[in-house]
Amino acid sequence: MKDIIVIKIGGVASQQLSGDFLSQIKNWQDAGKQLVIVHGGGFAINKLMEENQVPVKKINGLRVTSKDDMVLVSHALLDLVGKNLQEKLRQAGVSCQQLKSDIKHVVAADYLDKDTYGYVGDVTHINKRVIEEFLENRQIPILASLGYSKEGDMLNINADYLATAVAVALAADKLILMTNVKGVLENGAVLEKITSHQVQEKIDTAVITAGMIPKIESAAKTVAAGVGQVLIGDNLLTGTLITAD
């Protein structure tokens, strides 16, 4: 066991980091766990676009992103959300490093559908060696949800999908998908554990619905690809755990 944990946090969560979150990250790092943080930034991007009077358009839940929009998207992710995340972690005594120019050497991507979504990408390859160098130096690499095409274009990537790709590439012991809900609910209570074999049954019986479906399906595929377990919840310790069996 390498004790690698990949943590995905949303843009809103990264702006409102709790003391418990920061303490747990510090405790894990002190205990020798190897951590990687992937973050989105939808809230910050929307705010920046509104301030610049740029309309927000989404298709199938994905942000349509023009080349001009990417200037605002990258600014929000790197200079606002990522920078704030790094500052807060360092103030808590955590050794970490935000990846900026390094991203082009880590996340290879291709256009999802340029005609429909513009500069939105899907991960094609993770250069895990760059990430491993940070881990070997006892630093937490912080990755924004961005990637680069083979033509050198910066692309906007779904943070859940990027975190999943990173976890699979590193053969992580655990992937934590932090969201704004406590986990998968059944009859009002959080399901503490679901095996990957139970996922389709829970979808078919409408226990898992709407926006939780892609998260759970992604989690099941992640476990099938060799990641030990996936936790979906609103914190680092509790929620719904997805395992192989």
Swiss-Prot record:
Biological-process GO terms, alphabetical: arginine biosynthetic process via ornithine; L-arginine biosynthetic process
Chief location category: cytoplasm
GO molecular function, one term: ATP binding
Organism domain of life: Bacteria
Pathway(s): Amino-acid biosynthesis; L-arginine biosynthesis; N(2)-acetyl-L-ornithine from L-glutamate: step 2/4
Binding-site list for substrate: 41-42, 63, 156
Enzyme Commission identifier(s): 2.7.2.8
Any one of the GO CC terms: cytoplasm
Stored PANTHER family: N-ACETYLGLUTAMATE SYNTHASE (PTHR23342), N-ACETYLGLUTAMATE SYNTHASE, MITOCHONDRIAL (PTHR23342:SF0)
Protein known as: Acetylglutamate kinase
Organism of origin: Streptococcus mutans serotype c (strain ATCC 700610 / UA159)
